[in-house]
């Protein structure tokens, strides 16, 4: 058997010993970099267990790696998120319905349009129900409730929470939008809305309530389901934690990569001509700039709604 030295082998294949060493060092440096990012990803995932890779990248913003490479590497490492569909119907249709007041509406600030919806979650083989009320403009969850039934009491609890801390004068002209579920035409629920001079709006399709539908998926798929809850008591505790983390720590591209709480605080300090304007349009309704004022410019639409800014 003929023996060869490493230097002879390097010469045959056209590389140098220094080149091999440099390559090894680069690989070690990259490996250490990825391990460091993994530590940050794991820490973030403990609070936001279902957060997608692209959102994780923008949240962490690692300097040494681009978005696409980050997503590719961490997908291979098993950090991808499986999205679940929602096959269970929670809407019990009501005979009395209200007109859709928000289609095509311009929203220019907090407490102008709230959306609400009910969703379900299975815990230890039993269904429980979650009600959320969302401020469309800031994406902030204003109120929520956890229940073991579909009666209107949970909706009233969520609404009372949403109303707390908002001065009455800021609610005049606010529109509360929901689907046509019977919980939303309950006498006690309607009385609360009317007492605070909040207009009532309803949509006939899921697309008409898509902001609230999206929040259902975010709270369930990014928080509650990955936490593998085992009891009703745990569900209530972790739903509270999920809402808090969502409102204060989950960043949104539409909000300039701020959390809802950060965005609302920043928005109040902005001059009026620098505040974002949003047009509410359902998924199947074509968007037309001609219907808007000339000083409102369309920007890219990541979701079925257009985020706009006045120049």
Regions found by a protein language model. Give the residues of each.
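Basic, flexible linker segments flanking DNA-binding modules
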Residues: 15-110, 206, 259-273
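Double-stranded DNA-binding cores of transcription factors and transposases
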Residues: 1-9, 13
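C-terminal domain-tail junction helix/linker
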Residues: 194-198, 218-311
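Mobile genetic element proteins and their domesticated derivatives, centered on retroelements
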Residues: 9-10, 20, 41, 56, ...
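Mobile-element integrase/transposase regions
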Residues: 66-132, 156-161, 165-166, 170-173, ...
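A short acidic/small-residue loop/turn micro-motif
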Residues: 135, 146-153
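RNase H-like two-metal-ion nuclease catalytic core shared by retroviral integrases
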Residues: 91-93, 178-180, 186-191, 201-220, ...
């Amino acid at each position: 058997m003929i023996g060869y030295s490493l230097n002879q082998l390097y010469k045959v294949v056209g590389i140098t010993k220094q080149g091999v060493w440099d390559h090894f060092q680069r690989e070690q440096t990259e490996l250490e970099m990825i391990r460091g990012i993994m530590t940050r990803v794991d820490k973030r995932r403990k609070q936001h267990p279902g957060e997608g890779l692209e959102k994780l990248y923008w949240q962490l913003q690692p300097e040494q790696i681009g978005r696409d490479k980050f997503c590719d590497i961490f997908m291979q490492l098993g950090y991808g998120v499986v999205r679940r569909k929602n096959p269970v119907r929670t809407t019990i249709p009501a005979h009395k319905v209200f007109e859709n007041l928000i289609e095509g509406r311009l929203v220019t600030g907090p407490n102008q349009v709230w959306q609400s919806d009910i969703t379900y979650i299975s815990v230890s083989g039993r269904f429980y129900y979650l009600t959320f009320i969302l401020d469309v403009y800031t994406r902030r969850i204003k109120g929520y409730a956890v229940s073991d039934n579909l009666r209107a009491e949970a909706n009233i609890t969520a609404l009372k929470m949403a109303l707390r801390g908002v001065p009455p004068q800021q609610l005049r002209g606010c529109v509360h939008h929901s689907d046509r579920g019977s919980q939303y035409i309950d006498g006690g629920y309607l009385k609360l809305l009317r007492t605070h001079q909040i207009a009532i709006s309803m949509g006939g399709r899921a697309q008409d309530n898509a902001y609230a539908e999206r929040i259902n998926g975010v709270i369930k798929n990014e928080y509650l389901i990955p936490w593998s809850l085992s009891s009703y008591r745990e569900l209530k505790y972790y739903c509270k934690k999920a809402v808090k983390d969502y409102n204060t720590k989950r960043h949104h591209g539409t909000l300039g990569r701020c959390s809802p709480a950060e965005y609302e605080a920043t928005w109040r300090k902005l001059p009026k001509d620098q505040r974002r304007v949003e047009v509410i349009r359902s998924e199947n309704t074509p968007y037309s700039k001609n219907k808007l004022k000339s000083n409102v410019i369309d920007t890219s639409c990541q979701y079925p709604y257009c985020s706009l800014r006045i120049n």
